[in-house]
Amino acid sequence: MMEDPLIPWLTEHGLVCHPHTLSGTPISLGSAFQLAGLKLAWRVEIEQRRVWIVLIQRVEQRRGLKNPFAALYMLANAARAVLGPDYYLYGNVDVLAGSSLSTQRLAHFYRRWTGAKELSTGWFSLKVSQVITLSNMKKRQNNGFA
C-alpha cells in the first residue's frame, strides 16, 4: 500500500497517525488517528477520488463524545487541503456500539443535514468541500437552511 498523502498534514495539525490493519493481522486497511473520543481509520483511493472511511469507533466506553463529527471534519479538512475540493468522503453508515441512535435515523441525518448522497443502501458519499463544522450545521438548521 502506498504512503498515505494525508498523514503529513494530519501530523502537522497535532494528530498521531498509525497503520490500521484487519483485526490485528498484517493486512493493511489504511491509516488511523484518535480525536475527541473516537478512532477513525481511512484509506485514500486516488483513482476513485475518494477517502474511504474504514472505521469509526469509540475509544472510551459510553462517556459521551465531545463532538461526534470532529474526527470526520479533521479528515475532510486534510483531504481538501492535500487532495483538493473534488474528493469525496465515502463509507458505510452504522451506529456506534451501545448507541441508542438507530442506523435509519443516522442515515437520515447524513442525507438531510450534511447533503451526503446514498449511493446504495447504507453507503454514503459527501464531497469534502461540502463538509462544515457541527456549529455551522446547527446554525443552518436553526435558520431553516437545512
UniProtKB/Swiss-Prot annotation:
Pfam hit, one: LcrR
InterPro entries: LcrR/CesD2, T3SS_LcrR
Keywords: Calcium, Plasmid
Superkingdom of origin: Bacteria
Keyword Calcium in annotation: yes
Function, as annotated: Involved in the down-regulation of lcrGVH transcription in the presence or absence of calcium and is necessary for lcrG protein expression in the absence of calcium. Plays an important role in the regulation of the low-calcium response.
Protein's UniProt name: Low calcium response locus protein R
Organism: Yersinia enterocolitica
